């Protein structure tokens, strides 16, 4: 039972007045950049805030993210913060019954500005400040780390006194830079040498380049894994500082897609490492959600949800695309996709476009409305989707993504291995050529076309998963650590089946290979939990469920907008009843369940997407 309090997050689910609700979120002054604001300093910030909040409340927004922008004073070991705008935001939102999360870190909130605190690249050049690179200090620099911890604690303590503050965000889009290799700060190298000495290797120097084709990749792998571990440990450490100030406020960060895409080993961030320690897996997502890119959009969400689920937790879209030039169709499609991947909250970025300064980073670039409050093209459709989430939120938010019985291995070791052997002299993360990442993308797409969403898992958690896997797909046979290989063998001893993707044959090789490769559909048919399918190749189905009911998110991801007439969905799971509820935008209708040779439901008209609610049998 959840205690009835005005606002709370409990295991990633938002409760308001004791009722579980889907998080319908937005942002207001969420940035530390002085030119990323809706109202300039000389404007009527407080008057316009009240007007904006009234509009947001009318649109069913129930949670907002802001940033702890303020000033700090130090007295001995105590840091005090002053946040007049943030304080006013918290108070005004509480008056209208809206929850608040606070981003506690901007651009390294250190107060001492140590001369040696910056990250260094492979040429010992300090990282240059950039508005979109939020962590610039070495995460191993004790002085900078301590300063950030103290400031994080001070911010959390200040905002923790507001009853509607339910969550704390640690940094924004944290990762090593896209360009160059990091971090070669002396403090990082010293920590690396200590770690290697504990393994029996004295005076180990980190490599400054990837190995040549005839060199051992292991030194590079060890160095990248060390940096990733330290980077994510740093985020988790700051999360603990925030948590110590308000234990019932849930912690999260807002990761980009980089943990599971090309360049992941260079950038260091990892969903699983953060999921293990923080309360929520939070992410940013601006990928296109139509056409061929739809699968990558879905894959990133499913990986984030999987990382959370492995530890019995949930994921949120802390920033979801709401560009001012976004079409109504794009907004609707991405929302149905997010619902189906199991998000417990969507915080569309943002409510109002940034004020247009002469040198604004993103003037009027993101928002439901433009800075002058002119509605964007998507505005009316966005409000309809908000209303859908408001009306159906309790039917959605307490359901979990269906665990369909087939996993895909996530391996940081393999990511580092393929970074070492595939990327040569490339120093730009987005130009990566890691073969295993391309294999992952191909494998995910194959199973998605069988209407099976793969569950991403690490080898280290295979023996203690809170859900059952009958089969595990390994994207590439090479590049695994000895520990991972041992865990795969134990998984098979416990009755699981391991398949290795063969890129050459575009099929799968069982671990006990006896001359026959198998196709994705064969694995899906034998080991997958099939819920439903549809013949249209540009329609996807995603599945949520509780003990009594399925929620099937139906997504039309075709490039161009269309209306599909009489879309027939075949049901493979056992269901009961003669009809089922279908909700799409403002439309609500009951559809007949046809029980002939096949059990089907026909949607008379589908435009962009919708949700079917069907009772389990």
List the model feature ranges, each with a label:
Residues 22-26, 64-66, 100-104, 166-170, ...:
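Hydrophobic faces of well-ordered beta-strands that scaffold small-molecule active sites
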Residues 46-124, 230-245:
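Aromatic-lined substrate-binding rim segments of carbohydrate-active enzymes
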Residues 18, 56, 155, 168, ...:
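Conserved, mostly hydrophobic/aromatic
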Residues 38-56, 148-155, 262-274, 327-335, ...:
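Short, acidic/polar
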Residues 289-617:
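Carbohydrate-binding surfaces of carbohydrate-active enzymes
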Residues 1-58:
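N-terminal carbohydrate-binding accessory modules
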Residues 29-46, 67-83, 130-149, 216-233, ...:
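The substrate-binding groove and active-site-proximal loops of carbohydrate-active enzymes
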């Amino acid at each position: 039972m959840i205690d009835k309090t005005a606002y709370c997050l409990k295991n990633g689910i938002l409760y308001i007045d004791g009722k579980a609700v889907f998080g319908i979120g937005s942002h207001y002054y969420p940035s530390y950049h002085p030119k990323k604001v809706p109202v300039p300093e000389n404007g009527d910030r407080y008057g316009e805030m009240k007007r904006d909040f009234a509009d947001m409340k009318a649109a069913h927004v129930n949670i907002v993210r802001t940033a702890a922008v303020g000033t700090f004073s130090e007295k001995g070991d105590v840091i005090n913060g002053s946040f007049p705008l943030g304080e006013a935001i918290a108070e005004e939102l509480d008056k209208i019954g809206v929850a608040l999360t606070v981003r506690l870190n901007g651009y390294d909130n250190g107060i001492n500005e140590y001369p040696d605190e910056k990250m260094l690249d492979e040429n010992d050049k300090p990282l240059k400040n950039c508005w979109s690179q939020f962590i610039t200090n070495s995460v191993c620099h004790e002085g900078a780390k301590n300063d950030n911890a103290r400031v994080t604690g001070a911010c959390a303590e200040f905002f923790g006194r507001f009853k509607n503050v339910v969550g704390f965000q640690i940094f924004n889009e944290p990762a090593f830079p896209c360009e160059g290799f990091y971090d070669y700060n002396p403090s990082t190298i010293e920590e690396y040498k200590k770690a290697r000495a504990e393994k029996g290797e004295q005076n180990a120097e980190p490599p400054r380049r990837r190995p040549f084709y005839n060199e051992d990749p292991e030194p590079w792998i060890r160095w990248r894994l060390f940096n990733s571990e330290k980077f994510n440990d740093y985020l988790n450490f700051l999360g603990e500082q925030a948590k110590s100030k308000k234990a019932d406020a849930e912690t999260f960060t807002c990761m980009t897609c980089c943990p599971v895409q090309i360049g992941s080993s260079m950038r260091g961030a990892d969903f699983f490492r953060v999921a293990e320690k923080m309360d929520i897996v939070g992410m940013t997502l601006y990928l296109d959600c139509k056409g061929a890119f739809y699968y990558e959009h879905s894959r990133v969400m499913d990986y984030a949800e999987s990382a959370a689920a492995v530890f019995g937790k949930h994921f949120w879209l802390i920033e979801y695309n709401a560009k001012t030039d976004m079409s109504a169709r794009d907004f609707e499609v991405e929302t149905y996709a997010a619902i189906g991947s199991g998000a417990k909250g969507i915080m569309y970025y943002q409510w109002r476009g940034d004020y247009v300064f002469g040198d604004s980073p993103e003037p009027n670039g993101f928002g439901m409305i433009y800075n002058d409050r002119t509605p964007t093209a998507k505005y009316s459709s966005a409000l309809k989707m908000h209303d859908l989430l408001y009306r159906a939120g309790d039917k959605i938010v307490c359901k979990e993504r269906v665990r369909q019985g087939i996993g895909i291995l996530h391996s940081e070791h393999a990511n580092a291995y393929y970074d070492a052997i595939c990327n040569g002299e490339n120093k730009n993360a987005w130009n990566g050529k890691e073969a295993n990442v391309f294999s992952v993308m191909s494998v995910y797409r194959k199973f998605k076309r069988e209407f099976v969403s793969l569950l991403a898992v690490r080898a280290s958690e295979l023996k203690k998963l809170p859900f059952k896997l009958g089969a595990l797909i390994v994207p590439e046979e090479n590049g695994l650590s000895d520990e991972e290989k041992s865990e795969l063998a134990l998984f098979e001893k416990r009755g699981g089946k391991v398949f290795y993707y063969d890129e050459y044959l575009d099929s799968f090789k069982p671990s006990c290979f006896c001359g026959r490769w198998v196709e994705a559909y064969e694995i899906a048919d034998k080991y997958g939990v099939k819920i439903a399918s549809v013949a249209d190749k540009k329609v996807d189905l995603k599945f949520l469920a509780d003990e009594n009911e399925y929620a099937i998110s139906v997504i039309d991801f075709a490039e161009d907008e269309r209306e599909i007439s009489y879309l027939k969905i075949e049901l493979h799971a056992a269901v009961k009843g003669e009809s089922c509820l279908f909700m799409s935008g403002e439309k609500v209708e009951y559809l007949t369940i046809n029980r002939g040779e096949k059990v089907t439901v026909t949607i008379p008209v589908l435009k962009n997407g919708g949700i079917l609610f069907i009772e389990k049998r």
